Amino acid sequence: AIAGLTPPKESKAFAKXEKN
């Protein structure tokens, strides 16, 4: 996920979801 598009908290959750 792109940090600029998502808030810090959601960024971590989205990053994991997208990677997996």
Curated annotation (Swiss-Prot):
Record's keyword terms, sorted: Chloroplast, Photosynthesis, Photosystem I, Plastid, Thylakoid
Function: Probably participates in efficiency of electron transfer from plastocyanin to P700 (or cytochrome c553 in algae and cyanobacteria). This plastocyanin-docking protein contributes to the specific association of plastocyanin to PSI.
Source organism, top-level taxon: Eukaryota
Subcellular location as annotated: Plastid, Chloroplast thylakoid lumen
The organism's taxonomic lineage, starting at the top: Eukaryota, Viridiplantae, Streptophyta, Embryophyta, Tracheophyta
TM segment ranges: none
Family: Belongs to the PsaF family.
Ranges of compositional bias, category Basic and acidic residues: 9-20
Chloroplast found in the keyword field: yes
UniProt-recorded name of the protein: Photosystem I reaction center subunit III
A GO CC term assigned to this protein in UniProt: photosystem I
A Gene Ontology BP annotation from the UniProt entry: photosynthesis
Region (Disordered): 1-20
Main subcellular location of this protein, as a coarse class: plastid
